[in-house]
Amino acid sequence: GIFSLIKGAAQLIGKTVAKEAGKTGLELMACKVTKQC
């Protein structure tokens, strides 16, 4: 029903946000390590 639809959308959004946050975090760490911030 509608609940599984919302749950599926929430999971998809969560995964996307986590992926973007992870990418941003890695870039931040890399620029700190190489001192190019």
From Swiss-Prot:
InterPro entries: Antimicrobial_frog_2 (IPR012521)
One cellular-component annotation, GO: extracellular region
One family name in Pfam for this protein: Antimicrobial_2
GO biological process terms on file: defense response to bacterium
Membrane-crossing residue ranges in chain numbering: none
Primary localisation category: secreted
Keyword Metal-binding found: no
Tissue: Expressed by the skin glands.
Keywords per UniProt: Amphibian defense peptide, Antibiotic, Antimicrobial, Disulfide bond, Secreted
Signal peptide (from-to): none
Protein's cellular compartments: Secreted
Cysteines paired by S-S bonds: 31-37
Described function: Has antibacterial activity against the Gram-positive bacterium S.aureus ATCC 25923 (MIC=32 uM) and the Gram-negative bacterium E.coli ATCC 25726 (MIC=16 uM).
Protein family (similarity comment): Belongs to the frog skin active peptide (FSAP) family. Esculentin subfamily.
Protein name: Esculentin-2HSa
Organism: Odorrana hosii
